[in-house]
A protein has these predicted regions:
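Polybasic "coupling" helices that flank or enter modular domains
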Residues: 107-156
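Glycine- and acidic-residue-biased ligand/ion/polar-headgroup-sensing regions
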Residues: 19, 30-43, 48, 59-61
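Cyclic nucleotide-binding regulatory module and flanking cytosolic helices
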Residues: 1-18, 62-63, 67-70
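Cyclic-nucleotide recognition modules
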Residues: 53-114, 118
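Short phosphate-coordinating micro-motif centered on Lys-Gly-acidic
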Residues: 22-28
Length: 156
């Protein structure tokens, strides 16, 4: 993520403690977050108050994920710090300008968001498996894709 770092260093930083609710349904964020460390969960609550995790945001993933494209749309889900999180605070007007001035950083952010989308597809694929053993195997694949780091540029 070297190409994003010059942009992220220009942004203010805010910390959240594990368990902090960052956004609630109906909030219209005035800023976006880019986690520099830690994990933010996106979840919904059913009518019994049971949380249902939808997806997690890790390093360099936009929160809310549609914020850059639709900055004035209210969020539909809860966003909560799963771990202690340090985030860059992206201003609605300034952040797109910074990205447009650095095409390599913009491309890198696109790759990060694409990776997140692929992970979401794996998670959905996991949930629709009819057999428990298949759910476990697909969940393992999802976890490997989502949280593992490449050990070599030639090894996924």
């Amino acid at each position: 993520m070297l190409r994003l770092e010059p942009i992220l260093k220009q942004l203010p930083v805010k910390s959240y403690r594990a368990g902090d609710v960052i956004f609630k349904p109906g909030d219209t964020p005035k800023f976006g977050l880019i986690p520099l460390s830690g994990v933010i969960n996106t979840y919904s609550c059913d009518h019994n108050g049971i949380e249902r995790r939808i997806i997690s945001a890790k390093e360099y993933e936009l929160v809310p994920n549609n914020w850059l494209i639709s900055p004035s749309v209210p969020v539909n889900y809860y966003y909560k710090a799963y771990t202690d999180v340090v985030c860059a605070i992206a201003d609605r007007r300034e952040f797109p300008r910074l990205l447009m001035s650095n095409p390599e950083a913009l491309y890198e952010l696109l790759l990060v968001q694409d990776n997140r989308m692929q992970a979401a597809k794996y998670r959905i694929e996991t949930l629709i498996q009819p057999k428990a053993i298949d759910k476990l195997l697909y969940m393992f694949r999802y976890m490997v894709e989502r949280v593992s780091l490449p050990t070599d540029k030639d090894i996924g």
